[in-house]
Amino acid sequence: MPKAVRITHGNLWANIESMCAAADLRAGRDVMVSWLPLFHDMGMVGFLTLPMCRGIESVCVTPADFLSRPLLWLELVSRYGGTCTAAPNFAYALAARVLARADGLDLSSLRFALNGAEPIDVSAVQGFLAAGERFGLPPTAVVCAYGMAEATLGVSFHPWGTPLQVDVLDAVALETDRRARPADPGAPAGSVRTFPVLGPPLAGIEVQVRDPQGAALAEGGVGVLHLRGDSVTELYLSVDGPRPTRDADGWLDTGDLGYLSGGRVVVCGRVKDVIIMGGRNIHPTDIERVALQVEGVRAGNAVAVRYVPAGRRESFAVGVESREAGDPAAVRRIEDGVRSAVTAEMGVRPALVAVLPVGTLPKTPSGKLQRSAAAALLDRLTAPN
C-alpha cells in the first residue's frame, strides 16, 4: 500500500544543515548541476530546496534531457563550472561510456559528485574517474553516499576530497556468518565481495546495526541499519491514517543491510532483496555484476531476483537486456554465458535466465531499476498460459 513520509520543517532544516556541512557547500562559490527528477527526494531536497535555502546557484534540466543525451550532464558541468552534482550509480557507468567519445570538456571544477539512491558498483565509480581524467576531473570527485526519504535525504557521505575507500570482504564470512571480515590478499574474485566505505553518520544522526533478534551488533557485524536523529521522520501517512516509523527509543528500521567500520557506514543491500540459498545470504547486486560482464548483455541492464519454481526450493532468476534478443542463437549463447559465469563466480546456479529486448526491464523516470517490478515481470514471463 502506498505511503507518504511526513517531513517536518525541523526534519528538513536539520538535514539541509548537516548536508551543507558535510559537503562544505557555500553560496557564491558553489554551482550545483542536476538532471534529477524533482518528485524524488534527491532532486527535490538536494537540488531544489537546499540551494534555495542557502542561496546557491543551481543549473537544472529534466531526466528526459539527460536520458536522451547523457553527455549534456557533463557539458553543463563544463559550461557553468559546476562544483556539485549527484546521480544514481547507473548514470556514472553511462557517463564513463559517453566521455570516452567526448572532446573539449573541462571537469576540473567538479569537487563533489554524489553517487547514491541505488547500490553502488565500485567499478562504475572507478570507470567514471578514469574516463574523466583527461578532462581534468579530480580523482576524489565521486562521493559515495547513503540516504533515504525517512531521513529527509542524507544519512552518510564519504568524506569529500578524499580517495574512494573500498572494503574487500571474504564472501563466506559475509554470506554465511554475517561478518565483515577482510578477504585474504590475492583471493580469487569469486570469493570476495567489495563495498564502498562511506563516512560517519551526518551530524545529528545516529546509526545502529542490529541482528535479526534486534540486538545491537559490534563493528563488523552485518545486520539491519537503524537510524535516530533530528532529520528522521516520526510518521508515515497512509490511507489508513498516520503510522509511527520509530520504536520506543526513537530508532527507525531502514530495511537496509550493512555494518560499521571505524565508525563509518557500509551498506550491503536490502533485506527484502537478499537471496537465501544453502544457508548463504546472497546480494543480488553481486549476481548482476557478474551477468553484466557477459558479451551481448546491455550495460547497466541486468537484474537478479528471488524465484521459486513450482514445487522447488527458493532460487533466483536473472533477467538481462540485449540488442540481440531477437536472434535465437544469440539468446541461447547469452543465456548459457550468464548461467556459466554466475555459477562459476558465485557458486550458485540460476533457475532461470531471461534475455529480454531493450527497454523491457522496468525503471523509474530517472532510469533506476525497479527490482520488485522486474521480479513480477519475470514471474509473468514464466507463468503457464
Question: Which residues make up each language-model segment?
Answer:
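Conserved AMP-binding A3 loop
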Residues: 1-14
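Conserved C-terminal "lid"/linker of ANL adenylate-forming enzymes
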Residues: 275, 301, 305-306, 317-318, ...
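Gly/Ser/Thr-rich phosphate-binding loop
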Residues: 82-86, 98-191, 206, 213-215
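Conserved ATP-binding/catalytic segment of the ANL
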Residues: 195-208, 212-220, 224-284
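Phosphate-coordination loops involved in phosphoryl transfer and adenosine-cofactor binding
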Residues: 28-29, 110, 222
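AMP-binding/adenylate-forming catalytic core of the ANL superfamily
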Residues: 78, 85, 229, 234-235, ...
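Alpha-helical scaffold elements adjacent to nucleotide-binding pockets in ATP/GTP-utilizing enzyme cores
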Residues: 11, 15, 47, 72-76, ...
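Conserved AMP-binding/adenylation subdomain of ANL enzymes
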Residues: 13-31, 41-83, 98-102
